[in-house]
Regions:
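Collagenous Gly-X-Y triple-helix signature in extracellular proteins
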Residues: 1-190
Length: 190
């Protein structure tokens, strides 16, 4: 199989289906095409977190899923996106929400911390996928968000804030389409 060189590096701005993203990381995947870990440059909409701070069951997840569906209508082959596992451990360490495999989701606090030096500040406040504490605590209906200043805070899950999805895309999606590549033949599994 031909190996495709990644033409981007962390901090670069790329466009997929009309949405601009910042490259957070490049993952080398052996014989598979390298992948780019991308974060929407700005909010792509607004949503309440939901009735609890469990991202897996949230209105925020539904909003991201709807956005991803709309991206498909604008030309992004969602089947080519590489699932990533997000850890829904809350800020206080409660692991009650487990992990979740997603094609797109807001960053978790751990991811936001890891890429803090690369992430550009967005114009509006945006949710993270991380809850403040477990559901049995008095502040179990709070989740983390990032203010337009770049600071992290907690807000009640009923608040409406920006939706800023992150996703992993194979580098082949950024190859020149004039090369006549058949993307259906490119594996996305590891």
């Amino acid at each position: 199989m031909k190996k495709y060189a990644v033409l981007h590096e962390p901090g670069d701005i790329v466009t997929l289906a009309g949405t601009r993203f910042v490259v957070l990381d490049v993952e080398r995947r052996g014989s598979l095409p390298d992948s780019l870990f991308l974060l929407a440059l700005e909010s792509v909409g607004a949503s309440e977190f939901g009735s609890s701070n469990n991202y897996a069951e949230s209105d925020l997840k539904k909003a991201v899923d709807k956005w991803l569906e709309d991206m498909g209508k604008r030309g992004l082959d969602n089947a080519k996106l590489i699932p990533r596992e997000i850890d829904l451990t809350t800020l206080d360490g409660s692991g009650c929400y487990g992990k979740l495999s997603v094609k797109a989701a807001p960053l978790t606090l751990d991811e936001a911390r890891e890429y803090a030096d690369i992430i550009p500040i967005a114009e509006r406040w945006c949710w993270l996928a991380t809850g403040w504490s477990g559901p049995s605590k008095s502040d179990g209906n709070y989740a983390l968000n990032v203010y337009s200043s770049g600071d992290w805070y907690s807000s009640g899950c009923s608040g409406s804030y920006g939706v800023r999805p992150a996703l992993k895309a194979p580098s082949i999606l950024f190859e020149d389409s004039e090369a006549g590549l058949d993307l259906s033949k490119i594996p996305t599994d590891e």
